[in-house]
C-alpha cells in the first residue's frame, strides 16, 4: 500500500552512489589531499566562538559572496551561493523545467544533471562524446537545435574524463543555440581557461563553481552560481531562503580570503598530477588520458581486477558500472605517498595486461 504512494516515475530510479565506507586511502571523490593551514584553523576557531548559533544564517550569504567575488574577480551581485553545486543544479532544473521539458547533456559527464532533471519530471537527451572523449562542436550545435531543450549543461573540465572544451568552442555553442548554456567549472582552477568573463555578454550563459575541489572545502558544501543580472533575478525566486548554514559561510569566507593558501594548494595538486600521469604512462597496457583536472582516467580490459586489488590494500578509487565506462578507473590525485601506493599496486605482477 505504502509503495503505491511513491511517484511511478522514480520506481526504477537509480540514486547517486555515495557510499561512506572507510578506506586507508580515499581517491574516489576528487577531494583535495591538502588540509587547512594552522593559521586558517585558528581563525576559524575564533570566528566560531563568536558565531550566534541561535539565529538563522544570512539568506544571501553576503560576506561569503563578497569573498568569492574577490577570489574570482567577478562582481558579487552576479553570484548566488548554494549548498554545494548539487543544490544549484537542482535549483536550475526548478527554475527552467516544466514537467516533460528537456535538457541536453553529454556522455560521459556528471550524473547529477540527469538525476535532478528526472526528479523534476523532465527529460534528458544525451549527446555522446567520441571514442577519445572529444566533442564535435558542429554536431552538438545541430543536436541541440534539433532537440530544442531548455538547457544544455556540461562540465568543463569534464568529469570523469578530465578533458576540456576550448573556450572558443563554448562561445560558438552559446551563440548558435536557443537555450540556456550551463558550464559547470567545478575543476576550473586546475585548467584556467574559464568562460566567466562572458557572463554579461551572453544572456543565456550560467557558470557553476564549487569550493569542494581546488579550495579543499568539500565538508562545507559550498557551490557558486554566476550569471547576468536578469537570469539571476529569476533563478533566485526558487532558491530556499536559508540554504547555506552560518558555519559554512563563516569558514568559507576565511578560506577564500587566504588566496596564497589556495594558490599553493593548487600548485601542489598540479605537481602531483604531473607525477601521477608520468608514472601511470610507464605501465604497459594502461591507456592514460590527459587531464586538466585533479584526477586521472585510465583504461584497461582488466580494470575490475585492478580495482579489486586496490580495495584489498585499502585504496578506494572510482570504478564505473556504465557500459561505456566499464573498463575505466578514475583516480583522484593524492599526496606523493598515496600516489606511490596506487602506482605500485597497479604495476604489480598481478595482472595479465592486454595491449590496446
From Swiss-Prot:
Catalytic activity: L-histidinol phosphate + 2-oxoglutarate = 3-(imidazol-4-yl)-2-oxopropyl phosphate + L-glutamate
GO terms, biological process: L-histidine biosynthetic process
Similarity section: Belongs to the class-II pyridoxal-phosphate-dependent aminotransferase family. Histidinol-phosphate aminotransferase subfamily.
Listed pathway(s): Amino-acid biosynthesis; L-histidine biosynthesis; L-histidine from 5-phospho-alpha-D-ribose 1-diphosphate: step 7/9
UniProt EC number: 2.6.1.9
UniProt key word Amino-acid biosynthesis: yes
InterPro entries with a match to the protein in the record: Aminotransferase_I/II_large, HisP_aminotrans, PyrdxlP-dep_Trfase, PyrdxlP-dep_Trfase_major, PyrdxlP-dep_Trfase_small
N-terminal signal peptide: none
Keywords for the protein's UniProt record, in alphabetical order: Amino-acid biosynthesis, Aminotransferase, Histidine biosynthesis, Pyridoxal phosphate, Transferase
NCBIfam families: hisC (TIGR01141)
Modification sites for N6-(pyridoxal phosphate)lysine: 213
Entry-linked SUPFAM superfamilies: PLP-dependent transferases (SSF53383)
Gene that encodes the chain: hisC
Subunit field text: Homodimer.
Name of the featured protein: Histidinol-phosphate aminotransferase
GO MF, one example: histidinol-phosphate transaminase activity
